[in-house]
């Protein structure tokens, strides 16, 4: 995916950036920085100036159906309005023309990994917040899982760990790593700086709608880069060989 002067004024200034196949990229920044706007623009869901390219083709040249085959998008919030059961909701997200037995295999795999195997018949409106978040994650993953969708290229997730407990976050991290190994680019709007420091391959840092830094994680997740943007004095500590970003004591 490439962004070429892509903007949604005044929320997102013209932006040039790219995410490579098989890369896990995190978008970070303070609240109101434009992270969700950038993700929705990259998904083709917000109009604006400039262009977003996917697999070398401008999003504007894809039909809605063609785009849905190539990328999946998880919004930060989405109420479960339908009365349908979980398995039917997932059916609506499976790739067209996929072999039914192959889809069933992936559904079982994803449901097991995200601890939902006992929820398939439950109506969406009877799910807890964490269950609904995991159901939505399975739907997004199912839409672009490469073994059943050879056209898949990109997964866009806005705050995917909302309402997840620690074990569920670990399970999601493992699935995203596996998806990247299969060649899918994954872009995540994130709020936990240490999680980004430990898991992202590359990071985009936004401030007031401007992409102020982008690059390898170790080059962006530095106190001197983060502190001016967040307005907090950060320092870096190394514990058991891992870098941790913490606030400086008063």
From Swiss-Prot:
UniProt keyword list: ATP-binding, Cell inner membrane, Cell membrane, Membrane, Nucleotide-binding, Translocase, Transport
Q: Which Pfam family, any one of them, does this sequence belong to?
A: ABC_tran
Instruction: Identify the GO cellular component terms for this protein.
Output: plasma membrane
Matching SMART domains: AAA (SM00382)
Q: Name one GO molecular function term.
A: ATP hydrolysis activity
Task: Give the matching PROSITE patterns.
Answer: ABC_TRANSPORTER_1 (PS00211), ABC_TRANSPORTER_2 (PS50893)
Cite the EC number: 7.6.2.8
The signal peptide stretch is none
Is Lyase there in the keyword field? Answer: no
- What is this enzyme's catalytic activity, as reactions? an R-cob(III)alamin(out) + ATP + H2O = an R-cob(III)alamin(in) + ADP + phosphate + H(+)
What membrane topology is given?
Peripheral membrane protein
* Keyword Transport on entry: yes
What class does this enzyme belong to in the EC scheme? translocase
| SUPFAM superfamilies registered for this protein in UniProt | P-loop containing nucleoside triphosphate hydrolases
**UniProt-annotated binding residues for ATP:** 29-36
Location in the cell: Cell inner membrane
Described by its record, this protein's role is as follows: Part of the ABC transporter complex BtuCDF involved in vitamin B12 import. Responsible for energy coupling to the transport system.
- Oligomer and partners: The complex is composed of two ATP-binding proteins (BtuD), two transmembrane proteins (BtuC) and a solute-binding protein (BtuF).
Concerning its family, UniProt says: Belongs to the ABC transporter superfamily. Vitamin B12 importer (TC 3.A.1.13.1) family.
Q: What is this protein called?
A: Vitamin B12 import ATP-binding protein BtuD
- Species of the source: Pectobacterium atrosepticum (strain SCRI 1043 / ATCC BAA-672) (Erwinia carotovora subsp. atroseptica)
């Amino acid at each position: 995916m490439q962004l070429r002067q892509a903007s949604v004024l005044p929320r997102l200034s013209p932006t040039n950036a790219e995410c490579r196949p098989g890369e896990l990229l995190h978008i970070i920044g303070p609240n109101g920085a434009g992270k969700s706007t950038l993700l929705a623009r990259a998904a083709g869901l917000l109009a604006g100036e400039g262009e977003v390219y996917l697999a070398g083709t401008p999003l504007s040249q894809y039909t809605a159906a063609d785009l849905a085959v190539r990328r999946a998008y998880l919004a930060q919030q989405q109420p479960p309005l339908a009365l349908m059961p979980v398995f039917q909701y997932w059916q609506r997200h499976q790739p067209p023309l996929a072999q039914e037995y192959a889809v069933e295999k992936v559904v079982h795999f994803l449901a097991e990994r995200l601890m939902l195997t006992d929820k398939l018949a439950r109506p969406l409106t009877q799910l807890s917040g964490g269950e609904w978040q995991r159901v939505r994650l399975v739907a997004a993953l199912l839409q672009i899982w490469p073994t059943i969708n050879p056209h898949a290229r990109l997964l866009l997730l806005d705050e995917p760990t909302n309402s997840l407990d620690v074990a569920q976050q670990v399970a999601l991290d493992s699935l995203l790593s596996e998806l990247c190994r299969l060649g899918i680019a994954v872009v995540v709007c994130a709020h936990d700086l240490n999680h980004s420091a430990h898991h992202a391959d590359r990071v985009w840092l936004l401030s007031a709608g401007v992409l102020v830094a982008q690059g390898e994680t170790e080059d962006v997740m530095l106190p001197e880069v983060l502190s001016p943007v967040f307005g907090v004095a950060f320092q870096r500590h190394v514990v058991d060989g891992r870098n941790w970003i913490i606030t400086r004591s008063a």
